[in-house]
Curated annotation (Swiss-Prot):
Subunit structure: Component of the RISC loading complex (RLC), or micro-RNA (miRNA) loading complex (miRLC), which is composed of DICER1, AGO2 and TARBP2; DICER1 and TARBP2 are required to process precursor miRNAs (pre-miRNAs) to mature miRNAs and then load them onto AGO2. Note that the trimeric RLC/miRLC is also referred to as RISC. Interacts with DHX9, AGO1, PIWIL1 and PRKRA. Interacts with AGO2, TARBP2, EIF6, MOV10 and RPL7A (60S ribosome subunit); they form a large RNA-induced silencing complex (RISC). Interacts with BCDIN3D.
Residues in Dicer dsRNA-binding fold domain copies: 630-722
Keyword Ribosomal protein: no
InterPro entries: Dicer_dimer_sf (IPR038248), Dicer_dimerisation_dom (IPR005034), DICER_DSRM (IPR044441), Dicer_PBD (IPR048513), Dicer_platform (IPR048512), dsRBD_dom (IPR014720), Helicase/UvrB_N (IPR006935), Helicase_ATP-bd (IPR014001)
Record protein name field: Endoribonuclease Dicer
Binding site for Mg(2+) 1: 1316, 1395, 1398
Origin organism lineage: Eukaryota, Metazoa, Chordata, Craniata, Vertebrata
Organism, as annotated: Mus musculus
Enzyme class: hydrolase
Gene name in the database record: Dicer1
Occurrences of domain Helicase C-terminal (ranges): 433-602
Tissue: Isoform 1 is expressed in a wide variety of tissues. Isoform 2 is specifically expressed in oocytes during their growth (at protein level).
Binding-site positions, ATP: 64-71
Length: 1916
């Protein structure tokens, strides 16, 4: 041992080698360079691994410090030799015997062998029983079992009687083999061995070779004797010699501190006092009965502690400790009941106070006086001064500080491609809270004996730091190991203590503190960094304590200083000699003695010549590897290979001596390195040279195969070799902030216009096409939804309808539905005639009528739009058609158009005057199909009504429904001063003409096709059947509009029809484009073919049962369930878009005779009734009261707007009604942050799909089906209407493509989410398979990197953008008045400035066009306002706007100078004007959101406000689809004030990520329609290579169907041979795509490969039977189970590549299975199910259930233990657990819930086996699924019935506002702890190996506690 200093050093000569003084340069060996890579020796492997090697090699006695490693070595050795023991006894196979000392140890061993292997184990522990067995009985046992575990007594009997001969045993394991030294059966058994010719391999295990103090000679003798008896070599584990026998040994220094001279005499005096007191207490003869506490105990303890501090540290410290103890004593004294005890405590208290007083005479306790400390302390301070840091400015670079290989680096993410920005905020910046590491070169521990010494020494050092600038750098802390031991139960206060200790350790690990003062507890087991200074303040008393504290000094340059008092030094030197001798003996027993290497370290310099270096580019002094640096290169290379947290891969070097005395080495790299062959070096003179040369040769080979780069460093995963895959694109130059591909980055794109509608305006005398828009009522509105008992008007009943006149043909598209008040109407676009021409004059008439429809009937014209048919991009005519003469054929109805032109009521109100002389005459037929206009009000924008019914039994003289007026006539006279001329005319019941122009989805269903809860259907029916709520008009006061009601009803459908037509044509165009680019489908469809209708996959009608049960079923299953399900939102001054903002008196009779409900709040009654005229007053009151009362009553379920019904309030406020009051009751639904039950992170409309425990609702409500599910089924069975074609050959249905282009924000009846998920998993599968087959030698890290680059959102976004998808996508809700450009119109540039959203000026928060609330805004308010409407409308006469419609549409706005519109993506901008409203966080009933200057609000602004967002003000039974899905719209605060200016009619703003989603959805769409081969071709055409390219010439071969089938993996799914293979596009590309080939070899060329293979997979037949699949090529099977640490497998790779493949395959198969589930899960449920089923926990649990772990091949001690725990846990639980990567151990253990860790390796082999089967079966997904489906089916069923959610997500949904997760903290044993605080409800902690595991453990505890305290929440 060349330890520099064993001799005592005098004070002067204390020479420490600190990093600062090191010749290696200042940074060498700083403690935070945690894992130093060794340069002169190979990275050592774990000692258990070394021991296992030794045991495989020869008979071995393993000496370990603990029991844990023993099992590992024994079990692994058994497994390695298992091929010798399978099969029948005797001729073929042997048996393995484990001997234990006592019966109770048998079971323990048995379970270990059974857990980790599939061997049959027999246990024999009972001598009585076993002794009586006959030979036959035994031989049966031996036949049955392969491993026999018996107590030594049983074994002795068996062997002595010859039941089993030693030659039949292949391995004999002796547990506790040290017993063999004594007279013990072990000895007898070994005697038998002497006579046996073929003796078994022997493994002895012992943990107790060293106990307490022992003499080196004895020890040596003991070991030698044991070796003799067991005929083995002893091998010690490195935990007995210094822990890493390879790291440079610390420099050991014994410092003689010199005697303590007590000049002041204070020391003597204090000592005297304390000793006198102790003597007194000891003399007190207090009788102690055995049961009682000793009254003097505490006093003795305190005084002796105090005395010890005085002696060791000196008077200053004694004073400090006395002060501390006095405080402690007060507590005891206060609680002490018993007189005697109390007296002793008081005595002690007095004494301590006396000591303090004595000290005060000598020094002021405030400052540290070094006269009063012991020499030991002085010495310590002197040592610490040597570690003073250098000046900071020399080193500014911090980059390697937080290096990823550190032990204490917390990896934040477990997944390979984290595109989600989920946990960014969790990352702590380590540099923030403490000085840069370079100010910190110390990382030290001072070991002391007593707790108090630690505490006071810490105080002293802190104090010294304040006074001595040289010590100011120290930041110290102490740890006293209170209950730090792993498993003892802990009390509450210990818990607190424990937390504190952990915090101390955390800081020390993070190098926030640089000095730890610790009691011996830290010697073992606690995870702390490598220190460069260890000081033993008290000398070590036994070998173990010496080694363990020395073992803490592991930094490359470190000092181990032992401080000794002069009087102790002699005896300690003796001890130290003993320790050294023991260490030496043990070291020699170490399987690889490192002494040899150390001896010649210094000779290394002249090795250079021994072997020439490997130099690149010799001319310019290029990079080189020399014989001295080669080993370092190899170590570094191995460290970079992919591995799991348990395995640190290291090279293995074997050196053998040749007969001539030279040595040669063989180097084996870890098995996942592409360089597989072992490398044999040339013979050299010394071991050291042999090892170095072989490394040098290896470097050369690695460089040649591209594993080392141009600088001879390991190539990263980003390696150049695979450049072509990464296809590194130039990042587009955009000014748009945000990361490309993320949700945060949004850009504008023009909306696409299908080619066939572009500039297709008919020209005079040019041939035209006339299409008829066919409308048929296919599903009439069911009675229970027809609350007003309205008559239904089937459109087909009247012949006059609309047509489209265009100059270009329109391709065939599927029929599609629109939903009118009468029910579902199917729309078809049929060609009526073509090739005819029209004259200029006719066209002008048609054009005028076209404009009339859009501007007057639909009132869509507004200042920003201008009718310019010649200049418009999308231009065609809409015109009326009718049956001409009697021919029964439709044609253009010119006569009708001319009549309209002549009509007086065409635009305004005709001025008919009736008088007494010419009274009004009522003609019934005029009113049968009429639209009427009241003539006495709203002159500029008159209201139009349908006549619903003629009440012939009523006349103007009938009784008026409200007491204020006698009759109707009186009402008109009084209110409008109108006289009627005909008092016998009947009255008219009227309905508003519809202003709901978005008819794409039905009103009674939400998007998922779920019925909306119709709160009080019964009540409402009654209401509509009575007269009260009807609107009644007098015919004489109305004019009849020239457009009949039947045609008007059809006109209302036009915007929806044209919009849907437009979208479907865009989709059809995309289908055709893909057909030419990818060769999937045909370019133009056959003439006679039409795709099946677009439908949403919903049930058509809803049976009344389910309706009546709505309250309990559909709500019961919805997440945001509220007890009072009447979600009434008061709808007040409802008004129709374009009406004049004058508040005149209105007269619609909305009569309501009910009194105010008693329970409504009193203030409502008073305020409301004051200003309302009586009639309106009543019904207003009723509605307000109800509505508001409802709001008062409970938390509003704001969260899923889908559940709002517009409430029908046909009432107008009168002029005098103050707007503020209205606003008080307006009370918007509260912002979502108050919704107690539903998180706003999840408002994506799945909020009300079933997550209940399988509530019956699932079956009764029509679940959201894939929009085209029905269609897909038809396609699959190929029974499409035109027989002979199918979407498999033609390409997908445009309806399905449209689904893939529709974001959930568009609030349509379908969206891309389901397809996206399917596409996502297929994409992963396709790319994975391609990479796997194309790069047979790339390891998993690289494959994974390439995959994540290819599937990243950023890449997909780029490809989607190139393909032109953004323009075709449907991103926002269809809202004709706001964002639809009618055909023939253009956006008028001059006037549209107010229409444009201006750049750079920010108002409140228009949430970008897609109208969804972004994650960032979630926290803010709901950002919606509702303005009172000026006139009540019937239920759907109500414009629905989404956020983006914060556009003001009316012309009046121009006049009133409305608001300048500005858009900012930041939800909080400074409110500087009255118009930038901010909603209060909590809008309570009385609060006024618009308190700012409401008085001067001019009314046209109200008008404007009505456009803001009525969709929140929903009337009662109308359906508004508008919900927000935060995942799409992230207008985050963090985007900075990015503002985007764009025009809503022609442009759309889309987040990059949505484009990526759309690419995935299209892939899903091609996959479901055309099969897998087509989907692969589609990907290739996008530019994602997933198939190999073959050049034109070899095309014929590629078409050979046999080969083809290789890749059409699921033949049932992909009839890919039918699909044309390559693109036969006009572009004539030379690319053709072939099929992937299975990589040729899975086994390496190796002389005995077959034999080795059979050895290695012996026993796997049972496994093959179990999974029911026989491998054709067994090498795949072996590879699937080989872990990277298993270096015995030299013939295949490890499982990582197969795992990479299998992971993607299982993900795809499971996703596909879920997608095709007839239950048609909604996207949210699909996502949850997928993450519940495709995750490590589930895979690992299944792997254990199917015994995968027994065949697992790994050599990794930690992994062994984790698997062990997990398997035991699984067996106890024996039941699969839901989501999340951990399973809970016990519910009770509330203190510290540590979830059981799921070994990732188990999940990995579950996946890798799938990959192996896939490869072995010739790439057949079907075969994989046949093996895996049976294993997974029970879980799939279980979860589908009751979808699990991850605890983290569930918690965030339960407590969206209040749950906050802390950053990760490290616990003392190196795990991670996360705390989640639920504000107001407590803090919950979770612990686990990774951040994610800990986070979900914490969430799970929080949930448990919350659920326990909230029984009232159903469905939790």
């Amino acid at each position: 041992m060349k330890s520099p200093a064993l001799q005592p050093l005098s004070m002067a000569g204390l020479q420490l080698m600190t990093p600062a003084s090191s010749p290696m340069g200042p940074f060498f060996g700083l403690p935070w360079q945690q894992e130093a890579i060794h340069d002169n020796i190979y990275t050592p492997r774990k000692y258990q691994v070394e021991l296992l090697e030794a045991a495989l090699d020869h008979n071995t006695i393993v000496c370990l410090n603990t029991g844990s490693g023993k099992t590992f070595i024994a079990v692994l050795l058994t497994k390695e030799l298992a091929h010798q023991i399978r099969g029948d006894l005797n001729p073929h196979a042997k048996r393995t015997v484990f001997l234990v000392n006592s019966a109770n140890q048998v079971a323990q061993q048995v379970s270990a062998v059974r857990t980790h292997s599939d061997l049959k184990v027999g246990e024999y522990s009972d001598l009585e029983v076993n002794a009586s067995w006959t030979k036959e009985r035994w031989s049966q046992e031996f036949t049955k079992h392969q491993v026999l575990i018996m107590t030594c007594y049983v074994a002795l009997t068996v062997l002595k009687n010859g039941y089993l001969s030693l030659s039949d045993i292949n391995l004999l394991v002796f547990d506790e083999c040290h017993l063999a030294i004594l007279d013990h059966p072990y000895r007898e058994i070994m005697k038998l061995c002497e006579s046996c010719p073929s003796c078994p391999r022997i493994l002895g295990l012992t943990a107790s070779i060293l106990n307490g103090k022992c003499d080196p000679e004895e020890l040596e003798e003991k070991i030698q004797k044991l070796e003799r008896i067991l005929r083995s070599d002893a091998e010690t584990a490195t935990d007995l010699v210094v822990l890493d026998r390879y790291t440079s040994q610390p420099c050991e220094i014994v410092v003689d501190c010199g005697p303590f001279t007590d000049r002041s005499g204070l020391y003597e005096r204090l000592l005297m006092e304390l000793e006198a007191a102790l003597d007194f207490i000891n003399d007190c003869n207090v009788a102690v009965h055995s049961k009682e506490r000793d009254s003097t105990l505490i006093s003795k303890q305190i005084l002796s502690d105090c005395r010890a501090v005085l002696v060791v540290l000196g008077p200053w410290c004694a004073d400090k400790v006395a002060g501390m103890m006095v405080r402690e004593l007060q507590k005891y004294i206060k609680h002490e009941q018993e007189e005697l005890h109390r007296k002793f405590l008081l005595f002690t208290d007095t004494l301590l106070r006396k000591i303090h007083a004595l000290c005060e005479e000598y020094f002021s306790p405030a400052s540290l006086d070094l006269k009063y400390v012991t020499p030991k302390v002085m010495k310590l301070l002197e040592i610490l001064r040597k570690y003073k840091p250098y000046e900071r400015q020399q080193f500014e670079s911090v980059e390697w500080y937080n290096n990823r290989n550190q032990d204490n680096y917390v990896s934040w993410s477990d997944s390979e491609d984290d595109d989600d920005d989920e946990e960014i905020e969790e990352k702590e910046k380590p540099e923030t809270n403490f000085p840069s590491p370079f100010t910190n070169i110390l990382c030290g521990i001072i070991f002391v004996e007593r707790r108090y010494t630690a505490v006071v020494l810490n105080r002293l050092i802190k104090e010294a730091g304040k006074q001595d600038p040289e010590l100011a750098y120290i930041s110290s802390n102490f740890i006293t190991g209170h209950g730090i031991g792993k498993n003892q139960p802990r009390s509450k206060q210990m818990e607190a203590e424990f937390r504190k200790q952990e915090e101390v350790l955390r800081k020390f690990r993070a190098h926030e503190t640089n000095l730890l003062i610790a009691t011996s507890v830290v010697e073992e087991g606690v995870d702390i960094p490598k220190c460069n200074l260890v000081v033993r303040f008290d000398l070590p008393t036994e070998y173990r304590s010496y080694v363990q504290s020395k073992g803490r000094a592991r930094a490359p340059i470190s000092n181990y200083v032992m401080l000794a008092d002069t009087d102790k030094i002699k005896s300690f030197e003796e001890d130290l000699k003993t320790y050294k001798a023991i260490e030496k003996i043990l070291r020699n027993k170490c399987s690889k003695s490192a002494d040899g290497a150390e001896a010649d370290v210094h000779a290394g310099v002249d090795d250079e010549d021994a072997f020439p270096p490997y130099v690149l580019r010799p001319d310019d002094g290029g990079p080189r590897v020399t014989i001295n640096t080669a080993i370092g290169h190899i170590n570094r290379y191995c460290a970079r290979l992919p591995s799991d947290p348990f395995t640190h891969l290291a090279p293995k070097c074997r050196t053998r001596e040749l007969p001539d005395g030279t040595f040669y080495s063989t180097l084996y790299l870890p098995i996942n390195s592409p360089l597989r062959a072992s490398i044999v070096g040339p013979p050299m003179d010394s071991v050291r040279l042999a090892e170095r040369v072989v490394a040098l040769i290896c470097c050369e080979k690695l460089h040649k195969i591209g594993e080392l780069d141009e600088h001879l460093m390991p190539v990263g995963k980003e390696t150049v070799k695979y450049e072509e895959e990464l296809d590194l694109h130039d990042e587009e130059e955009t000014s748009v902030p945000g990361r490309p591909g993320s949700t945060k980055r949004r850009q504008c794109y023009p909306k696409a216009i299908p080619e066939c509608l572009r500039e297709s305006y008919p020209k005079p005398d040019q041939p035209c096409y006339l299409y008829v828009i066919g409308m048929v009522l296919t599903t009439p509105l069911p009675d229970e939804l027809n609350f007003r008992r309205r008559k239904l008007y089937p459109p087909e009943d009247t012949t006059r309808c609309f047509g489209i006149l265009t100059a270009k043909p329109i391709p065939q598209i599927p029929h599609f539905p629109v939903y009118t008040r009468s029910g579902e109407v199917t729309i078809s676009i049929e060609l009526k005639k073509s090739g005819f021409t029209l004259s200029q004059q006719m066209l002008e008439l048609i054009t005028r009528l076209h404009q009339y429809i859009f501007s007057h009937i639909l009132r869509l014209e507004k200042p920003a739009l201008e009718f310019k048919p010649t200049g418009a991009e999308s231009a065609y005519c809409v015109l009326p058609l009718n049956v001409v003469n009697d021919s029964g054929t439709l044609d253009i109805d010119f006569k009708f158009m001319e009549d309209i032109e002549k009509s007086e009521a065409r635009i305004g109100i005709p001025s008919t005057k009736y008088s007494k002389e010419t009274p009004f005459v009522f003609k019934l037929e005029d009113y049968q199909d009429a639209v009427i206009i009241p003539r006495y009000r709203n002159f500029d924008q008159p209201h139009r009504f349908y006549v619903a019914d003629v009440y012939t039994d009523l006349t103007p003289l009938s009784k008026f429904p409200s007491p204020e007026y006698e009759t109707f006539a009186e009402y008109y006279k009084t209110k409008y001063n109108l006289d009627l001329t005909n008092l016998n005319q009947p009255l008219l019941d009227v309905d508003h003409t519809s202003s709901r122009l978005n008819l794409l989805t039905p009103r009674h269903l939400n998007q998922k096709g779920k019925a909306l809860p119709l709160s009080s259907a019964e009540k409402r029916k009654a209401k509509w059947e009575s007269l009260q709520n009807k609107q009644i008009l007098v015919p004489e006061l109305c004019a009849i509009h020239p457009i009949p009601a039947s045609l008007w009803r059809k006109a209302v459908c036009l915007p929806s029809i044209l919009y849907r037509l437009h979208c479907l044509l865009t989709a059809e165009e995309l289908r055709a484009q893909t057909a030419s680019d990818a060769g999937v489908g045909v370019r133009s469809l056959p003439v006679d073919f039409r795709y099946p209708n677009l439908d949403f996959g919903w049930k058509k009608s809803i049976d009344s049962k389910s309706f009546i049960s709505t309250c309990n079923s559909s709500l019961a299953e919805s997440d945001n369930y509220c007890k009072h399900s009447t979600t009434v939102v008061p709808e007040h001054a409802a008004h129709q878009g374009a009406t004049r903002p004058s508040l005149e008196n209105h007269d619609q009779m909305s009569v309501n005779c009910k009194r105010l409900p008693a329970e409504s709040p009193a203030k409502l009654q008073s305020e409301v009734s004051t200003d309302l005229t009586a009639i309106n007053g009543l019904s207003y009151n009723k509605n307000l009261a109800n509505g508001s009362y409802d709001l008062v009553n409970r938390d509003f379920c704001q969260g899923n707007q889908l559940n709002y019904f517009k409430q029908e309030i046909p009432v107008q406020p009168t002029t005098s009604y103050p707007i503020q009051n209205l606003y008080n009751y307006e009370n918007q639904p509260k912002p979502s942050n108050e919704c107690p039950l539903l998180s706003n992170t999840y408002l994506d409309g799945n909020a009300n799909t079933s997550t209940s425990d399988g509530s019956p609702a699932v079956s009764t409500m029509p679940a959201m089906m894939n929009a085209v599910k029905a269609l897909k089924d038809r396609m699959d069975s190929e029974q499409s209407p035109s027989v002979g074609y199918s979407s498999r050959t033609l390409g997908p249905n445009p309806g399905l493509i449209l689904q893939a282009l529709t974001l959930s924000n568009a609030s349509d009846g379908f969206n891309l989410e389901r397809l996206e998920m399917l596409g996502d998993s297929f994409l992963k599968h396709a790319i994975t398979t391609y990479l796997f087959c194309t790069y047979p030698d790339a390891h998993e890290g690289r494959l994974s990197y390439m995959r994540s680059k290819k599937v990243s959102n950023c890449n997909l976004y780029r490809l989607g953008k190139k393909k032109g998808l953004p323009s075709r996508m449907v991103v926002s809700i269809f809202d004709p008045p706001v964002n639809w450009l009618p055909p023939g119109y253009v956006v008028n540039q001059d006037k549209s400035n107010s229409e444009k959203w201006e750049k750079d000026e920010m108002t409140k928060d228009c949430l970008l066009a897609n109208g969804k609330l972004g994650e960032a805004c979630e926290e803010e308010e709901d950002l919606t306002w509702r303005a009172p409407k000026e006139e009540a409308e019937d239920e759907d006469d109500f414009l629905e706007y989404d956020q983006e419609h914060i556009q003001f549409i009316d012309s009046m706005l121009m006049g009133s100078g409305a608001f300048v519109r500005k858009i900012s993506l930041s939800p909080f901008s400074a409110s500087d004007s009255a118009y930038e409203w901010k909603m209060p966080k909590k809008a309570s009933l009385g609060s006024m959101p618009f308190a700012s200057g409401l008085e001067d609000f001019d009314y046209s602004s109200w008008d404007a406000m009505c456009y803001l967002d009525p969709s929140k003000a929903v009337e009662e039974d109308d359906f508004v689809v508008g919900f927000w899905n935060p995942s799409e719209e992230n207008c985050g605060v963090d985007t900075g004030k990015q503002s985007i200016s764009y025009d809503l009619h022609t442009e759309q703003c889309i987040a990059d990520k949505s484009i990526a989603d759309c690419v995935e959805a299209l892939l899903g769409c091609y996959l479901t329609s055309c099969g897998e081969r087509a989907a692969q071709l589609f990907l290739c055409s996008l530019g994602l290579k997933v198939l190999p390219v073959i050049k034109r010439t070899s095309r014929e071969k590629a078409l050979d169907p046999a080969q083809e089938n290789g890749s059409s993996q699921q033949k049932s799914l992909s009839g890919s041979c039918a699909a044309p293979v390559g693109p036969r596009s006009s572009a004539g590309k030379d690319l053709e795509y072939g099929c992937l080939k299975i990589p040729p070899r899975c086994m390496f060329d190796h002389p005995d490969a077959e034999k080795t293979l059979n050895h290695l997979i012996s026993g796997f037949e049972t496994f093959e039977k179990k999974i029911n699949y026989r491998f054709k090529n067994k090498a795949y099977l072996l590879q699937a189970f080989t872990h990277a640490s298993y270096h015995y497998n030299t013939i295949t790779d490890c499982y990582q590549r197969l795992e990479f493949l299998g992971d993607a395959i299982l993900d795809y198969l499971i996703t596909k299975h879920l997608y095709e589930d007839p239950r048609q899960h909604s996207p949210g449920v699909l996502t949850d199910l997928r993450s519940a089923l495709v995750n490590n926990t589930i895979f690992a649990s299944l792997a254990v259930k199917y015994d995968y772990h027994k065949y697992f091949k790994a050599v990794s001690p930690e992994l062994f233990h984790v698997i062990d725990d997990f398997v035991k846990f699984q067996l106890e639980k024996n039941e699969m657990q839901g989501m999340d990567s951990e399973l809970r151990r016990s519910e009770e253990d509330e203190e510290k819930e540590e979830d059981i860790e799921v070994p990732k390796a188990m999940g990995d082999i579950f996946e890798s086996l799938a990959g192996a089967i896939y490869m072995d079966s010739g790439m057949s997904l079907e075969v994989v699924w046949q093996v895996y489906y049976p294993m997974m089916q029970p879980l799939i069923e279980k979860f589908s019935a009751n979808v699990p959610r991850s605890p983290v997500r569930e918690l965030l949904e339960m407590e969206p506002e209040t749950a906050k997760f802390s950053p990760a903290e490290r616990t003392y044993d190196g795990k991670v702890r996360v705390t989640v605080e639920v504000v107001g409800k407590g803090k919950f902690k979770g612990v686990g190996r990774s951040y994610r595991i800990a986070k979900s453990a914490a969430a799970r505890r929080a949930l448990r506690s919350l659920k326990a305290n909230q029984p009232q929440v159903p469905n939790s």
